[in-house]
Each structure stands twice: as C-alpha cells, then as structure tokens.
Amino acid sequence: MDCTAAVDIEVDNVLPTRRSLRVAVVTETYPPEVNGVAATIARAVQGLRERGHELQLVRPRQDKHEAATQDERFAEVLLRGLPIPRYPQLKMGLPSKRALLRHWSSHRPDVVHLVTEGPLGWSALQAATQLKLPVVSDFRTNFHAYSQHYGMAWLRNPIMSYLRKFHNRTLCTMVPTAGLRGELMSTGFKSLRVVSRGVDTAMFDPARRSPALRQQWGVGPQDMVVLCVGRLAVEKNLGVLVQAFQGMQAVDPRVKLVLVGDGPERSALQQRCPSAVFAGLRRGEDLGAHYASADLFLFPSVTETFGNVVPEAMASGLAVVAFDYAAAHQVVRHGDSGLLVPFADSAAFCAAAQRLAGQTAWVRAMGEQARMKACQMDWGRIVEQIETVYVTAMSHHTVTTHHALRPALPLL
C-alpha cells in the first residue's frame, strides 16, 4: 500500500520552522536497547538530523568499550551508568552535572531536550538551568503507575510529586496524547503540548509476512496467530493476555500465541502457556517480519503513555484489541481497524478477543483498515512539531530569563 499521502494526525496547532538549531538531547535509553522510548527518540533524532539540525546526544555508556560517535553535525556525549535492577541489559544514567556544565560551557546548545527523568535527566536539568539554557522535556513513561504493580503503591504519590517538579522546571513538556495531557494537567503539570508519535511504514509492512516463519511457529496458512510485543513484565498486565488467549483457544483450538520480547515474567508465562511461542527480543526487519506474520494483535497494558506497538502492529496489517486509551484511543477505530474496550475492563478485553476467534475474514479486513490508518502517521510531521516546540521555548526563554519562576508558554 502506498503510504506517501499523509494526512493530519492529533497534534497541537503548530507551524513548522526551518531554522537550523543546535540541540542537546538527554536520554537514559537509546538503541540498541529495546523499548518504546529508545525507539521513538532515535527516530526523532534521525528526523532532526535529516532536517539539518546539529545534535548532541547525551546518554549513558552502554558498555565500557563503547566509543562515542562523532561527525560534523552529530556528537555523542557518553557518561556513566549502572545496570537497572532486573533489567541488566538497560542502563540508568548517573548524576553528571559537573561533566555537563563543562561540556555545555564550551559546546553551548540552543535548546536542551530532556527525554527521561532519571538521575542523568535531573542533573542535566540542573546544569542547563545554571547555564540559563532553554529546556523542554518529554513525559514518556508512567513510572507512578508502575509502582502499584510491584507492591509499592505507597510510592505513587512521591513519584508523581517528583515528576511534576521535574517537568514544571522546564519550559514545555511534550506528551503523546490529549488524554494524557488532560490527566497531567489535573494533577498540576503545566505547559503541556501534544506531540504524537509516527510509525515507520516501510519497516512495519504486511509485505514482510513470512510463510517460513509461520511454519516455524507450527501454524497453517488459515490458522490465526495472536501476537503480543513488549517487555514481559508485571506492569504489562500479561495475566489478562493469557486469559484472553485461553478464551480464544476454547473457540478455536488452532489459535497460536506468539510473544516477542523478554523480561522477568517470561518463566512464569512459559509455565502458564506452554504452547505459546516465545520469540525473545527482535529488532529491525526481523521484528517487522514477526509483526507481519501474525494476524491479530492483543495489547492488554494499562500503564502506557502511548504504546508504540499499537501503530507498529497496525502498519503491519494487524487488527488490534486494546483498552480504549493512549495510542489505541487515538488511532484504532472500533469495529473498523480493531476492537476497543473500556479502560482496565479485563472481562471486556477477554470477550473482545474471544469474539474474534475463528473470524479470519473479519480480522483480515480490519487489518487492511489498520494499515491504511497507520499510513497517515507520518514521522516528518512529528519532527516539525518538535522543531516548533524548540523554537517557541527558545523565544520565550529569551524574553523571560530574568524571572525566577517558570513562565507558562503561550498556546502554540
């Protein structure tokens, strides 16, 4: 399908700008690490570079032998990091205020973009504030919501207080959906701007469907493959996935479940679903082939700020079953490209999945519509929105640097 004709998607009303900028992007995760934040910020960085901007990428060193990439308009600044508990393949950046003060004093950016709120992000905020640099941020992960899934619900309010303090010290916080903006505004977050997410419709394409891969999974051409992609962790609500799949099996025993991803819940899931395929971490074209070789995408998570896997599945030609919030609310049309159910209603989720068992023709028809919708999610327009947030923040910062308190940006 031709995906060249993009149409408007949900973003604030902003105008693109073509001024070349020096941008420092600070993130505690980046490819080859596999997660939604790493994937989307890497795509944004690529888009900004393609549009002629000069980028500094500030991140933790992923291993002790890693060398920073440097060229004329792109420079990595690699700092100290530690493995994250239970996720040793991921790094948490350590406080690096002094190093950033030194670097930004001699390589001063026009604007600092904080992607994550960890120790590195906080020290970058402090350094940028001390140097009187304009700072914008992203709200990308519902850490406050994760706490209840790890038996630490008492941490929810302190975490939210920290996140609010962090983001309210920046000139603008970008959020991926209007729903999240409303939720955060109601708890005291300020200057929020909707900048959605795009999807790579060349990487995620039904043309990557692989009969050989389906044969490896032990399914025939007409058998339904149900896919879930993401971290195998308790906050992803995977118990509901198992229930939904078992309900589908009761209707059609040939249904196959494939899980792409890894995490601490893998062993428990393998015990509960011995017939499922656990494909582990997949990247690039291999990941695209796994998406395209399935038929239906089940997404039971209730802790997403967006959920990049939803448009990736849709771009791959899969119908989606999801809770009606975040990316699914924004891009899935109920009954046309998938089925949406009320937020956190596990029984409704399982019933929707079971309803599609054996309905191969309907699922395929919704998958075709899903592909058409995904083709409207153009990354070029998203990068334009980010550019304009930068320029607006820079202009406002220049006018108001004498104020001690953070001013609110005018509506874009």
Descriptions of predicted regions:
Residues 302:
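Aromatic "clamp/platform" in nucleotide-sugar-dependent glycosyltransferases that forms part
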Residues 220-246:
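Conserved donor-binding/catalytic core segment of Leloir-type glycosyltransferases
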